[in-house]
C-alpha cells in the first residue's frame, strides 16, 4: 500500500500528519492541500475507529499519535478545603474530545467519517486546495 511522501523526510511527514490530524479533531474542519488532505483522511479514519472501540489499548495508541493539545477550558464544581463548592477550570484535551465527543457520534457508521470539498487553486503557487471536515 503506497503513501505520499509530501516532499518531506519520514519524521517531518509524521509530525505534519500528527499536527493536521489533531487540528482536524479539534476544529472538525481545516483547509489544506489536496495531497495532504488525502493522507490525513487515512490517519483520522483509523483514529476515529479506534476511538469507537474505546478500550485502554485504543486510547494509548491514539495518545501516542494525537498531540497533547487543549481544546477548551470548562468550569466544573469542586469541593474546597473548607467543604464549600468552588468553580475550577478544567482543560479538555484533543484526545478526550476524540473519545468522548467525536467517536460516539459515529457509533452506527462504518467508516467514511471525513469529507473532502475542493476549493480551487492557491493564489501563490497554484496548489489545489481543499476543505477536509468531519461528516
Swiss-Prot record:
It comes from the Bacteria. GO terms for cellular component: cytosolic large ribosomal subunit. GO terms for biological process: translation. InterPro entries: Ribosomal_bL17 (IPR000456), Ribosomal_bL17_CS (IPR047859), Ribosomal_bL17_sf (IPR036373). Keywords: Ribonucleoprotein, Ribosomal protein. One of its GO terms (molecular function) is structural constituent of ribosome. Belongs to the bacterial ribosomal protein bL17 family. Part of the 50S ribosomal subunit. Contacts protein L32. This is Large ribosomal subunit protein bL17. It comes from Listeria welshimeri serovar 6b (strain ATCC 35897 / DSM 20650 / CCUG 15529 / CIP 8149 / NCTC 11857 / SLCC 5334 / V8).
